[in-house]
């Protein structure tokens, strides 16, 4: 059993803390909002103002603070403010502590902001007196607590091997015998994977809405069209389809059908900016603006690089 401190007790923090508590860990919630603390205490959980967390002997500290946008730009002020408390907690103990970042942050934030701040303020070294891992959450707001206990994927981005092992051990009651895929990777990859997940979901919804809008313009049931496409389009049901970067889509159908339908839409008065962007990106990749490292290395060495885009009969 570990002693876990949650820094930031919103949706993610509460789902994480309550989940770890159900797994048998000793959990204390920290937040700056009194009403949040009162509700947690009423539910039977230990909850204190975040500034008192250094007094709690936690072996793991989970950062689950909001990273909102203001005027379209990400704000890290809540995270930065919390780092002072976390550093004090690290400095106050001779025991190894694991810092787990659950915030959604741009790639490089953990390495370039979080770790240097913690080392400087605590006077201790990452990888020795404390560890750092980025553990992106893929929780849905409406079912966050259930999603924590029943994950479809776990991603552990870690500064060093011990950090990764310690983090996996926290989740061991969930992972044992449940065949949940676990990805151990570096910090930047874990940070980017969270964004890629959210950006893909957003792009898929916008694609559906663009098709739905075109269907409505044409007097077609867009919901029925997307229900069919969800089963007929390989990209909908094959999770590996189109996930190898650096290759344009090709074949007999995709290039001609995308350009033909965009022209048809323009002639019919249908605005399809997402489809236009899809074609633009593909043209850039085909022109060599985006080349995978392994292809560039092969070309530099005189070898040939294999590859191909998604095609399909048509």
Predicted feature locations:
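NAD(P)+-binding Rossmann beta1-loop-alpha1 motif at the extreme N-terminus of oxidoreductases
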Residues: 1-56
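NAD(P)-dependent Rossmann-like dehydrogenase/reductase catalytic/cofactor-binding core
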Residues: 2, 6, 212, 216-314
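Alpha-helix C-terminal capping/helix-to-coil transition sites in glycosyltransferase folds
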Residues: 56-57, 151
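Rossmann-like NAD(P)(H) cofactor-binding subdomain of soluble oxidoreductases
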Residues: 60, 68-138
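Structural motif
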Residues: 62-64, 155
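Internal alpha-helical scaffold of NAD(P)-dependent oxidoreductase catalytic cores
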Residues: 117-135, 140-237, 264-271, 277
